[in-house]
Structure formats: C-alpha cells, structure tokens
C-alpha cells in the first residue's frame, strides 16, 4: 500500500475531469458535474463522501469498515458512501473519485477518459 491519501491528492481531479468543477458550500469542498455533487469533503477534510451505488454500499462497508462508512441518515436515499481519507492510499482515493465521476457523466465521457488514461488516474 502507498502513502495515505490527503485532500491534495484528489483536489486536482475536481477541475481536470471533463465537465467537473470544484465548489465550496458552507466551507466544504465539493466536486460537481452540472448541479450533481459526486464528491464532498467534511469540514476537517478527513472524510470524503463519494457517489457510490446504493445497492453495493452495505457490502463495501462490511468488507472494509476501517475505510468506508454508511452516509448520514439524510444521505441514505442517495447513491453515496463515506470514506476515511487516512485509511486510503493515494491511488485508491483517486480511483474512487474517478469512479464517482463516472456515475454522473455520459458513458461516452467515460470511454474517452479510459482511452486517454489506460492505466487509470494514478
């Protein structure tokens, strides 16, 4: 496993991924495509909430509870899961951001990204 992830490892993706842009809402950094939030950081920037399929999140949390937690009660209705940045390595954190972005963009953008990043976000 590589070095633990921090917000600076993933912040550039908020502006680099096609149609994505970073915003601050009540002091919290979020990444959006249009009006859809696909990544949101806690105020202290230790937790990264990410778009993730509802039907798969319980299994993800159960498989790696030291890394992933269920979202807050108000976010349970969304395709969302929380990740502890310190428990992730840099590559894993970047892959989670790209996977979250994939959930909110057209498939043609996903295919174009794959062609230009054959080894993933690194």
Locations of the language-model features?
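Charge-dense, helix-prone N-terminal extensions
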Residues: 1-122
């Amino acid at each position: 496993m590589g070095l633990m992830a921090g917000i600076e490892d993933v912040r550039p993706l908020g502006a680099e991924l096609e149609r994505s842009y970073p915003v601050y809402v009540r002091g919290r950094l979020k990444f959006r495509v249009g009006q859809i939030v696909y990544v949101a950081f806690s105020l202290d920037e230790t937790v990264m909430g990410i778009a993730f399929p509802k039907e798969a999140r319980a299994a993800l949390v159960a498989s790696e509870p030291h890394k992933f937690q269920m979202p807050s009660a108000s976010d349970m209705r969304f395709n969302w899961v929380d990740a502890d940045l310190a428990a992730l390595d840099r590559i894993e954190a970047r892959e989670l951001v790209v996977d979250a972005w994939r959930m909110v963009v057209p498939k043609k953008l996903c295919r174009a990204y794959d062609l230009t990043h054959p080894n993933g976000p690194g």
